[in-house]
Amino acid sequence: MIELKNVNKYYGTHHVLKNINLSVKEGEKLVIIGPSGSGKSTTIRCMNGLEEVSSGEVVVNNLVLNHKNKIEICRKYCAMVFQHFNLYPHMTVLQNLTLAPMKLQKKSKKEAEETAFKYLKVVGLLDKANVYPATLSGGQQQRVAIARSLCTKKPYILFDEPTSALDPETIQEVLDVMKEISHQSNTTMVVVTHEMGFAKEVADRIIFMEDGAIVEENIPSEFFSNPKTERARLFLGKILKN
């Protein structure tokens, strides 16, 4: 379980997260939505120790993150898929996938490569194992990044707007891979996204944020058909109209 307890985050005098209380259960698919600047990405980055909270606690598997232990804990339990793919350009796809398992988890090359081939097949890129990232489309690179996160076999995968940097033509291929993972895997997924169709289909629970606060928490069927708050209704009215 990942828990945020009374989490506040400031950038200077700017209050970015305001008393966030949130728990993510094992195996849950949690989707965080809201307008730009609402604190969604900061929330998920706090979960992974990429941002230090100003006050409150972040707890991962009953371990409270602090500046001394956060790297060790998050490396053990959390994988992250970013807006931009962060693949090593001088390494092949296969080398990108086997680096962390071999270096950090001390897997043998044989075991790491077997796992890499398994997940390249899952994301539909088995034939791209020996090419370099620059030869791939944006959608393909993001699918490689997802496969890389799966190769670490960590219990939590956090997705920070994984389709926002993609061309419209390649967004669906990434969403399809994420849907497949959500249906076949017991992995806990936390997804920040503007893709409402994906949220409706995949999420066990929706978190709607605005101005650094959680405004509404609901199951998808209720949130999209009958949101509890006026702000959520206005947001959905605008975004679904487009």
From Swiss-Prot:
Residue numbers binding ATP: 34-41
GO cellular component entries: plasma membrane
Sequence ranges assigned to domain ABC transporter in this UniProt record: 2-236
Source domain of life: Bacteria
Single GO MF descriptor: ABC-type amino acid transporter activity
Keywords: ATP-binding, Cell inner membrane, Cell membrane, Membrane, Nucleotide-binding, Transport
Entry keyword annotation includes Cell membrane: yes
Location in or out of the cell: Cell inner membrane
Membrane association type: Peripheral membrane protein
Function: Most probably involved, with PEB1, in a binding-protein-dependent transport system for an amino acid. Probably responsible for energy coupling to the transport system.
UniProt similarity note: Belongs to the ABC transporter superfamily.
Protein name per the record: Probable ABC transporter ATP-binding protein PEB1C
Annotated organism of origin: Campylobacter jejuni subsp. jejuni serotype O:2 (strain ATCC 700819 / NCTC 11168)
Gene of this entry: peb1C
